[in-house]
């Protein structure tokens, strides 16, 4: 299935690229979420008319993500959790908890933007957590977990 990308898609291409994908990926993900359109003559002409508008929207999203990344770079978030004598938490700190703490600190962050490659946090300590704000913009935040 040949499609025209309407935005940058990870591991696939950039805005305006013509790509060949499997039919299921196109029908079930790219087309319904507005990330692509079918590559025919009418859609190609319509895309070329809207290209400047789409590029401006993509640049605005990236600029917004970069400003949020600059705010996050200065932040250090402290999360209090109940823990045992040896520093092991009763429960865990996940992406939702970190996103809530960052939002409370004044920077709007969605749960899906927080990346914990080693899984949830289960020990008291300091952690560097990646926040994926845009396909080209990633920030690192220091999260300090203390025992209550």
Curated annotation (Swiss-Prot):
Which terms does the UniProt entry file under GO BP? translation
Name the keywords, alphabetized: Ribonucleoprotein, Ribosomal protein, RNA-binding, rRNA-binding
Molecular-function GO terms, alphabetical: rRNA binding; structural constituent of ribosome
Q: Name one Pfam family in it.
A: Ribosomal_L9_C
What Gene3D superfamilies has UniProt attached to this entry?
Ribosomal protein L9, C-terminal domain (3.10.430.100), Ribosomal protein L9, N-terminal domain (3.40.5.10)
Question: Which InterPro entries does the entry link to?
Answer: Ribosomal_bL9, Ribosomal_bL9/RNase_H1_N, Ribosomal_bL9_bac/chp, Ribosomal_bL9_C, Ribosomal_bL9_C_sf, Ribosomal_bL9_N, Ribosomal_bL9_N_sf
Identification of the protein by name: Large ribosomal subunit protein bL9
What is the organism field in this record? Pseudomonas entomophila (strain L48)
Q: Which gene encodes it?
A: rplI
């Amino acid at each position: 299935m040949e499609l025209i990308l309407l935005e940058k898609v990870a591991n696939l291409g950039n805005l305006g690229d013509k790509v060949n994908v499997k039919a299921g990926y196109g029908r079930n993900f790219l087309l319904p979420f507005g990330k692509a359109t079918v590559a025919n003559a009418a859609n190609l002409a319509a895309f070329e008319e809207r290209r400047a508008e789409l590029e401006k929207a993509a640049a605005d999203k990236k600029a917004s993500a970069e400003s949020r990344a600059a705010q996050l770079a200065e932040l250090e978030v402290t999360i209090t959790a109940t823990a045992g004598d040896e520093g092991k938490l009763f429960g865990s700190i996940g992406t939702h908890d970190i996103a809530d703490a960052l939002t409370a600190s004044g920077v709007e962050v969605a749960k899906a933007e927080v990346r914990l490659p080693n899984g949830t946090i289960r020990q008291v300590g300091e952690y560097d957590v990646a926040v994926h704000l845009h396909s080209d913009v990633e920030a690192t935040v220091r999260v300090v977990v203390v025992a209550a």
